[in-house]
């Protein structure tokens, strides 16, 4: 929005052209979302307290979680609001990738909001019926996959189209799984669906301790922002042997907004948390990360950088599978962070150690740019 305005003003004075620079707009995006989150945070917390939108604690949760009862939830609304405003202000709104990510954010955020609201309003931990949740998240993720496929196939360069659809294998030069050979982009669309929904649910499962999910989200968004910047520049992409994708540079503005909004939320979510993000935040943020990973064609690297999210999700699958097949537990409690709590780790120890793991994994993900 402001990019368009400054482009009009550039005709009157050349100094307005400075806003065209992606690096400046990305920095302004961070500062804008950070400021919005910090300023509106106390207001949002007071409003949630007044509405009595407090967190319910499961009877199966570790004993030390009882003190979290009543802490305001649905704080993810503030995160999404900060990201949305910052993106609309500083991103190039003619870029289709910007609107796809925002669309995914809105739909997954709405599903998360409905899930949170039902849990609070009706004291029902089941939340939104699984069929409705599945339907709307499927609409958003499949819609994103179809849109990305159509954008890719509009290009006249067949090699470029293949680069936008095939699954890149990290640590190797020019090695990929050819999803593009399946007619009508079915393999690509289904794979996109799995990545977006998998990321959304994995982040949601991770969001069980104060600050545990939001900081890895910030770190992974930073890593994806680097890939978005490099893959959107044909010179960097060719030099680093990564796919050049025409529209991805503008995703840096969105990643920057996620970083600023996430850090602002962490200010109030740090232990002891004053507010929780709820499903409205976790589902949307995970879906956004998954969508951006698909756009920059770095799904496997995304799984590496988001290894904490992967471990949390896998721990739940293993626990459920083992209980059904063997009637035995693999972990003391799932997701994984609760297992370590049961072993005697303090909440802050679990959180900070998972942050450290994420830092190392994001660095490893970035190393794939040169280790080929």
Curated annotation (Swiss-Prot):
Keywords of this entry: Cell cycle, Cell division, Cell inner membrane, Cell membrane, Cell shape, Cell wall biogenesis/degradation, Magnesium, Membrane, Metal-binding, Peptidoglycan synthesis, Transferase, Transmembrane, Transmembrane helix
Any single GO BP term: peptidoglycan biosynthetic process
GO-annotated cellular components: plasma membrane
Membrane-topology descriptor: Multi-pass membrane protein
UniProt-annotated location(s): Cell inner membrane
Catalytic activity from the UniProt record: UDP-N-acetyl-alpha-D-muramoyl-L-alanyl-gamma-D-glutamyl-meso-2,6-diaminopimeloyl-D-alanyl-D-alanine + di-trans,octa-cis-undecaprenyl phosphate = di-trans,octa-cis-undecaprenyl diphospho-N-acetyl-alpha-D-muramoyl-L-alanyl-D-glutamyl-meso-2,6-diaminopimeloyl-D-alanyl-D-alanine + UMP
Superkingdom in the source lineage: Bacteria
Listed cofactors: Mg(2+)
Pfam short name (any one): Glycos_transf_4
TM ranges: 25-45, 73-93, 98-118, 134-154, 176-196, 211-231, 251-271, 275-295, 300-320, 349-369
InterPro entries the record matches: Glycosyl_transferase_4, PNAcMuramoyl-5peptid_Trfase, PNAcMuramoyl-5peptid_Trfase_CS
Pathway listed: Cell wall biogenesis; peptidoglycan biosynthesis
Gene Ontology molecular functions: metal ion binding; phospho-N-acetylmuramoyl-pentapeptide-transferase activity; UDP-N-acetylmuramoyl-L-alanyl-D-glutamyl-meso-2,6-diaminopimelyl-D-alanyl-D-alanine:undecaprenyl-phosphate transferase activity
Top-level enzyme category: transferase
Function: Catalyzes the initial step of the lipid cycle reactions in the biosynthesis of the cell wall peptidoglycan: transfers peptidoglycan precursor phospho-MurNAc-pentapeptide from UDP-MurNAc-pentapeptide onto the lipid carrier undecaprenyl phosphate, yielding undecaprenyl-pyrophosphoryl-MurNAc-pentapeptide, known as lipid I.
Membership in a protein family: Belongs to the glycosyltransferase 4 family. MraY subfamily.
NCBIfam families the record matches: mraY (TIGR00445)
The protein's name in its UniProt record: Phospho-N-acetylmuramoyl-pentapeptide-transferase
